[in-house]
Amino acid sequence: MSLATTQSIAEIRARNKELIEEVLKVYPEKTAKRRAKHLNVHQAGKSDCGVKSNIKSIPGVMTIRGCAYAGSKGVVWGPIKDMVHISHGPVGCGQYSWGSRRNYYVGTTGVDSFVTLQFTSDFQEKDIVFGGDKKLIKVLDEIQELFPLNNGITIQSECPIGLIGDDIEAVSRSKSKEYGGKTIVPVRCEGFRGVSQSLGHHIANDAVRDWIFDKLEPEGEPKFQPTPYDVAIIGDYNIGGDAWSSRILLEEMGLRVIAQWSGDGSLAELEATPKAKLNILHCYRSMNYISRHMEEKFGIPWCEYNFFGPSKIAESLRKIAGYFDDKIKEGAERVIEKYQPLVDAVIAKYRPRLEGKTVMLYVGGLRPRHVIGAYEDLGMEVVGTGYEFGHNDDYQRTAQHYVKDSTLIYDDVNGYEFERFVEKVQPDLVGSGIKEKYVFQKMGVPFPEMHSWDYSGPYHGYDGFAIFARDMDMAVNSPIWKKTKAPWKEAAKPKLLAAE
């Protein structure tokens, strides 16, 4: 059990501040001064978490961030299932981004859906010297011949494309005209842009604006009959089928989901989104830009929602219903009431097994704050959290709505810092990504992988909460953790293996 369970708030705050100072001591003075701005202990009543964010990582540290290409291709565009996404540049970026994140979809792979396939222009040295536009044209022609049912193509630029100045926009316009108006989207997401994958999200949002929305032509005959209850799910990547479990609740309360993207999304759904009455935004960090644009240009309001855990689900359903009439408000209450027996059963089964357990998180997007409510519904306490690529508004939301007094906050934490924090705080569970998973498991710390749900899920919605509770119980209470200490060390004082 964590030390947090036996200490007062003041003692925990003092311990965490001391821990930050201890971690910073190993750095050179200049580095320590820079990193100190990213580490803090939350104080109740403050409007933010007191850390600097969205700043370039220090060269030489083991940062856990990605690049702009990862943010565009790997997060925003990649899950659009009926479009082919070209990793334009050397093969490495495509190879190492292939299959690294689950995005479930409905379709026949290689025929009308292409999410799990990897397309690359395989740049060589001669392409750097003489330019890659001719190779890109050849790749586009091959895709058009081999995959004729694709509904569009995106060109995801890797670093060399921006460095040598290839005109991918001109190629896109030319080939689109040649293919009879096919949607071809050039995305300037070279990895050297920005400080993390976050700029890649923004660039991808801008590409949707400039190459999808701005090219929509006024319709003669509408493609579908609009209703007052049309909504679009934005920023759910359907990692474990989460968009589907969320969609069930929205439709049960009387709304019609006309688009969901990017997870299990299509080009047609992108094009239909400007006709929604409300955009409901799951991942604020990666999709708030396009949501704000649609509010400004099309007058579509948007709201952020959280379907992790029953408390936040009920809160979000009522928040969404507030944009509609009494029919939808009554529908929201009906849905909450319908699933209450399931919630009660899950909590009755798992809360006694998880009550008082402590958690430290370090993930991307919205999860450093959104999953806190689900843990608290199970009686667990989040004692530390941080964002890989968060901005100041993420930390404001975290401080104002999620974390408790004395919570340890760490932005762009590196491998050294995170390991030292876990050693000293001794949480019962650490939730982070695949790069951290095996480090902490070898330290004897239960670890659910919180980027892809450890190939479980969904975790969204009421059904997802049952799976989430089961997985957290399996992680924390697995008998294997009793076997991590050598028998001849059993008599020693219990502590983390890494501290030995």
UniProtKB/Swiss-Prot annotation:
InterPro entries reported in the protein's UniProt record: Nase/OxRdtase_comp1, Nase_comp1_asu, Nase_comp1_CS, Nase_Mo-Fe_asu
Keywords: ATP-binding, Iron, Iron-sulfur, Metal-binding, Molybdenum, Nitrogen fixation, Nucleotide-binding, Oxidoreductase
Cofactor mode of binding and number, as noted: Binds 1 [8Fe-7S] cluster per heterodimer. Binds 1 [7Fe-Mo-9S-C-homocitryl] cluster per subunit.
CDD domains: Nitrogenase_MoFe_alpha (cd01976)
Known catalytic reactions: N2 + 8 reduced [2Fe-2S]-[ferredoxin] + 16 ATP + 16 H2O = H2 + 8 oxidized [2Fe-2S]-[ferredoxin] + 2 NH4(+) + 16 ADP + 16 phosphate + 6 H(+)
Cofactor section: [8Fe-7S] cluster; [7Fe-Mo-9S-C-homocitryl] cluster
Gene Ontology cellular component annotations, sorted alphabetically: molybdenum-iron nitrogenase complex
EC number: 1.18.6.1
Residues where [8Fe-7S] cluster binds: C67, C93, C159
PROSITE patterns: NITROGENASE_1_1, NITROGENASE_1_2
GO MF term set: ATP binding; iron-sulfur cluster binding; metal ion binding; nitrogenase activity
Function of the molecule: This molybdenum-iron protein is part of the nitrogenase complex that catalyzes the key enzymatic reactions in nitrogen fixation.
Protein name from the UniProt record: Nitrogenase molybdenum-iron protein alpha chain
Species this protein is from: Bradyrhizobium sp. (strain ANU 289)
Lineage, uppermost ranks: Bacteria, Pseudomonadati, Pseudomonadota, Alphaproteobacteria, Hyphomicrobiales
Annotated gene: nifD
